[in-house]
UniProtKB/Swiss-Prot annotation:
Primary residence: virion
Function: Forms a proton-selective ion channel that is necessary for the efficient release of the viral genome during virus entry. After attaching to the cell surface, the virion enters the cell by endocytosis. Acidification of the endosome triggers M2 ion channel activity.
Record protein name field: Matrix protein 2
Species this chain originates from: Influenza A virus (strain A/Seal/Massachusetts/1/1980 H7N7)
Gene that this sequence comes from: M
Gene3D superfamilies: 6.10.250.1640
GO CC terms of this entry: host cell plasma membrane; membrane; virion membrane
Misc note: When the channel is activated, one or more imidazole moieties of His-37 probably become bi-protonated.
One GO biological process term: protein complex oligomerization
Subunit annotation: Homotetramer; composed of two disulfide-linked dimers held together by non-covalent interactions. May interact with matrix protein 1.
InterPro entries reported for this sequence: Flu_M2
Membrane topology of the entry: Single-pass type III membrane protein
């Protein structure tokens, strides 16, 4: 008697996936979450430089000038421009009073 006659071979029906026909809400939710995770992962890897640069530098803004007259805004811009002098590749910060 050989070993091949004693081993049961699985029939094709035993290998089929039963998830494809399932309307179980848990399976549907897991599929949606998996697809969204994949999309976000791809977008993150494609655009991470833009996204993190925007988060790092985009949130650092100057003080709000809402309600300030235009003449005072222009004066403030000029003071900010003259506050940093470039001298032989050195930056000098001048505090305004």
């Amino acid at each position: 008697m050989s070993l091949l006659t004693e081993v049961e071979t699985p029939i094709r029906n035993g290998w089929e996936c039963k998830c494809s026909d399932s309307s179980d809400p848990l399976v549907i939710a897991a599929s949606i979450i998996g697809i969204l995770h994949l999309i976000l992962w791809i977008l993150d890897h494609l655009f991470f430089k833009c996204i993190y640069r925007r988060l790092k530098y985009g949130l650092k803004r100057g003080p709000s000038t809402e309600g300030v007259p235009e003449s005072m805004r222009e004066e403030y811009r000029q003071e900010q421009q003259s506050a940093v002098d470039v001298d032989d590749s050195h930056f000098v910060n001048i505090e305004l009073e």
